[in-house]
């Protein structure tokens, strides 16, 4: 609570396996360097490395109020685990080269995070009174439930990227937009199901495929 947390040479948060972090009215900054061993670069990661030093289970990140500053890479990355991410009224500063808001996929990490083609993520993401920008990337070996509540907004696209999904699977991306929440579609999007009581808007003719 009311913490100042700054990582000058790494991601801001790394949660592995059955562990959790809850922040209230805190300021979080990450500055991870690009690394050829990784498939991508991130600010917050929820994952399972299979090194044996962390019990397998649901990883949880919850943040209520405060700020996140991302100085390099995408924002949230989850792979080879089950996880819960909940954001409420967090002020987010993105870097100019941010590749995603959330990536929920398998991986081909050179450190060996699970079996390639079977190491996706099962992610429950909830935005509460939360403004968000950037793409949400998912694949067919992952399960993503993405909830927008209480006036949350997203400016971005839902992108199905099978680069790290091997032969694929039966995964999904379910999107729920509650009343007073808004998704502004900035790129052609693919999702599995949509429940919309809010608003979906697009000024550039982008498509949403379900």
Regions found by a protein language model. Give the residues of each.
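Short, intrinsically disordered, charge-balanced linker/junction segments flanking boundaries
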Residues: 1, 5, 207-210
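Beta-strand-rich solenoid/repeat architectures in extracellular/passenger domains
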Residues: 2-9, 24-43, 59-72, 88-102, ...
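Glycine-centered low-complexity coil/loop motifs and glycine-rich tracts
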Residues: 5-17, 30-33, 70-77, 81, ...
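Short, recurring structural edge motifs at helix starts
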Residues: 9-12, 44-53, 72-75, 111-113, ...
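Parallel beta-helix/beta-solenoid
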Residues: 17-18, 23, 56-58, 63, ...
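Acidic/polar low-complexity surface segments
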Residues: 30-55, 95-116, 159-168
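Long, ordered, amphipathic alpha-helical scaffolds
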Residues: 50, 54-55, 80-81, 198
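Extracellular beta-solenoid/beta-roll
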Residues: 116-119, 123, 129-210
């Amino acid at each position: 609570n009311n913490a100042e947390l700054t990582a000058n040479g790494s991601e801001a948060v790394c949660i592995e396996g059955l562990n959790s972090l809850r922040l209230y009215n805190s300021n979080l900054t990450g500055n991870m360097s690009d690394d050829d061993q990784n498939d991508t670069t991130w600010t917050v990661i929820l994952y399972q490395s299979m090194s044996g030093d962390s019990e397998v289970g649901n990883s949880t990140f919850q943040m209520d109020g405060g700020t996140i500053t991302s100085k390099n890479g995408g924002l949230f990355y989850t792979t080879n685990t089950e996880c819960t991410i909940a954001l409420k009224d967090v002020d987010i500063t993105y870097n100019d080269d941010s590749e995603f808001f959330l990536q929920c996929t398998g991986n081909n990490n050179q450190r060996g995070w699970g079996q390639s083609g079977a190491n996706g993520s099962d992610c429950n993401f909830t935005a509460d009174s939360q403004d968000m920008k950037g793409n949400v990337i998912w694949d067919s070996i992952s399960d993503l439930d993405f909830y927008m509540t209480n006036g949350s907004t997203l400016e971005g696209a839902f992108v199905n990227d099978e680069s790290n999904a091997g032969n694929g699977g039966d995964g999904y991306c379910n999107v729920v937009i509650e009343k007073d929440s808004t998704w502004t579609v900035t790129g052609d999007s693919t999702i599995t199901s949509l429940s919309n009581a809010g608003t979906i808007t697009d000024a550039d003719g982008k498509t949403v495929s379900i």
